[in-house]
Regions:
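Compositional signal for N-terminal targeting/processing segments
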Residues: 1-624
Length: 624
């Protein structure tokens, strides 16, 4: 008969990764089931490729912008995206590879990352349950620890008796779950996972028995054991169908990740901190404290901070002394950090050290502490193995760049685009579409200037490729399969967030340069309504300057009427300003400067417009 072994883990814990490895080696299970996005199970071969860790599964759901609005709204689908990150010491990563190595059936059994259960969860392997547990916080403070992270390291990330690790973790996770009521999202996930486990047990029974190992977050361990015990196996593995293409676009892809991103999740999305420290602990448990102390010293010296050899030795000695004082067999993360702070910081601190609580660094944090924390975060960047499947957007974007003679560079290199050149429109379309997508490294350094008397018809851009670029482009696949479709979807999403006329005018200008003239046509009525409601003179002035530039760039768009409306509104708001200091307010000055900039374009009825502006300004000066 098949036997179930549920291994509860804390995500990204070396101790839990060791436990998973030991259980799989001892049990030789017929199946290894892992808390992870089940839609990736048929594609587990992608995770077996020789990637440079860390990597992550990126999952997304985006409501269709070009479908039936009523159908989309009625579906309840919301825009969401999230990651399931893996590093070498992730228990889930160890389970994937060790399970496959012994020939076990390996599968992810959790809901896909695009499911509504993850609508508010950007990191599947976050630490929300550890952070909100009152029982664990009370236990930490009762035993003299600043945080549950320090308590965890004290209890588990220590050399010790691995034979009792599973039992000790079980007691810890029971306290973690306690009597707390699971959320609707947790219940949906646990119900789905229980079906997957029940099916795997039935399959194992049919095949002659064996052990089925489940690796899941400790918060779910007891609930899964209880649910599976009372569950009848379904006839097939559970599956969730994605929304219809007319309602939403969903998908999951591998992306390169980094220690910085792993450590930069905030709030309930954050996982275990200081990934470089735990990587060192996984690679060399005995040498990790000294390795990380010297990594911090090296980083400080590289940033021009003076650290003597005596101070470096003192930091290591203090770490070991604190470990002995706190009853640790080897220095923990906090022992090493406290030792570094005690040895290297010579002046009184204005606030508690950052690792005493789960928070972001505050402004004014001592520069030594900033660099020490950065050293423990680490600068390792992941990379996908050659041949890893990628969304169609990646190939389409590369083809679009090549077609217009553009290429990424590793250093800032000016790309000059003469907007009157025959190929300018095509090149600008690609550049502005990349800008709409927010791909890192895409920067417009200089705008073209078509104002009268100072025509400078050259835009200057940079396309700087770094370790974030490949992953960012894959993540942009949430918006569409081609550069044109993805950027247009991003335009429509951006427009949903805009209300002010200045923002609308800026969006219209950038949409036109990206080749979406139809968007400009669609926005004319909305912009007219926004003009009529605009209460701020500076915003009306800024909109006038933008619309003037847009009109000069493409006089066929029929924007003369809008220009007249926004000019009337701006002048009316200007004359309505009162008070002796109103003319000196920064917003008023900005508005006047914007009107002046607009007048430097060749506008319809330019002489009449200039005369009206001049008269309004004179009246305002006389009234001040």
């Amino acid at each position: 008969m098949a036997r179930l072994r549920v291994v509860g883990v804390r995500h990204h814990s070396p101790a839990c990764a060791r436990l998973v490895r030991a259980v799989i080696a001892a049990e030789r299970p017929v199946a290894v089931l892992i808390e992870g996005p089940s839609d990736m199970t048929p594609r587990l071969g992608e995770l077996a490729l020789p990637h440079q860790l860390p990597v992550a599964i990126y999952s997304y759901c985006l409501p269709a912008h070009d479908g039936d609005p009523d159908a989309v709204a009625g579906s309840g689908v919301v825009a969401q995206a999230g990651w399931s990150p893996f590093c070498a010491y992730s228990p889930e990563w160890v389970a994937l590879h060790d399970g496959a190595a012994i020939g076990a059936r390996v599968a992810f059994i959790d809901l896909p990352g695009w499911h509504p259960a993850f609508a508010t969860m950007s990191n599947r392997y976050g630490d929300r349950d550890h952070q909100v547990s009152a029982a664990l916080r009370d236990a930490a403070h009762r035993h003299g620890f600043d945080s549950t992270d320090a308590l965890w390291d004290h209890l588990f990330e220590q050399p010790g008796d691995d034979a009792t690790l599973g039992a000790r973790l079980g007691a810890y996770f029971a306290a973690l779950r306690g009597e707390a009521e699971a959320s609707d999202a947790d219940r949906a996930r646990e119900d789905f996972m229980a079906d997957g486990v029940a099916w795997a047990l039935a399959e194992a029974d049919a095949g002659g028995g064996g052990t089925v190992v489940v690796v899941c977050g400790g918060f779910h361990q007891a609930a899964l054991e209880r649910l599976v015990a009372a569950r009848t196996a379904p006839p097939a593995p559970p599956r969730v169908e994605p929304p219809a293409a007319a309602i939403a676009r969903t998908g999951s892809y591998l992306v390169p990740f980094s220690f910085f991103r792993l450590d930069s999740f905030t709030g309930y999305a954050s996982g275990m901190p200081s990934p470089a420290f735990y990587q060192a602990l996984w690679d060399d448990p005995a040498g990790a404290p000294e390795t990380m102390a010297m990594a911090a010293v090296t980083r400080l010296r590289g940033r021009g901070q003076r650290v003597s050899t005596a101070d470096a030795i003192a930091a290591v000695e203090l770490s070991h002394g604190l470990a002995r004082l706190r009853g640790h067999a080897a220095p923990t993360r906090c022992d090493v950090l406290d030792g570094l702070a005690a040895a290297l910081i010579k002046e009184a601190l204005r606030a508690p050290v950052p690792w005493s609580a789960r928070t972001t660094l505050a402004r004014g944090t001592d520069p030594y502490l900033v660099e020490i924390v950065a050293a423990f975060s680490g600068d390792r960047d992941g990379a996908l193995a050659p041949g890893t499947p990628q969304p169609p957007l990646v190939a389409d974007l590369a083809a679009e760049l090549a077609a217009v003679g553009l290429a990424w560079s590793r250093t800032p290199t000016p790309i000059r685009v003469d907007i009157f050149a025959p190929d300018a429109a095509a090149r600008r379309r690609v550049l502005y579409r990349l800008r709409w997508l927010g791909v890192p490294g895409v920067q417009r350094v200089q705008r073209a200037d078509l104002r009268r008397g100072r025509t400078q018809p050259v835009e200057v851009w940079q396309l700087v490729e770094d370790d974030r670029t490949a992953g960012a482009i894959i993540e942009c696949a949430v918006w569409g399969a081609t550069l044109a479709a993805a950027a247009l979807a991003r335009v429509y999403r951006h427009l949903q967030e805009l209300t002010g006329v200045a923002e609308l005018a800026a969006a219209m200008e950038d949409a036109l340069h990206a080749g979406y003239g139809a968007v400009v046509d669609q926005l004319r009525e909305r912009a007219a309504d926004a003009i009529a409601r605009e209460p701020q003179f500076a915003a009306a002035g800024a909109a006038l300057a933008r619309l003037a530039a847009l009109h000069v760039a493409d006089p066929t768009r029929g924007l003369a009427g809008l220009l007249g409306q926004v000019l009337d509104r701006a002048l009316w708001l200007l004359e309505g300003l009162t008070g002796p200091t109103a003319a000196l307010d920064a917003a008023v000055v900005d508005g006047v400067v914007a009107i002046r900039a607009a007048l430097e374009f060749e506008l319809p009825d330019h002489a009449l417009v200039a005369e009206r502006v001049d008269a309004a300004l004179h009246r305002r000066v006389e009234a001040a």
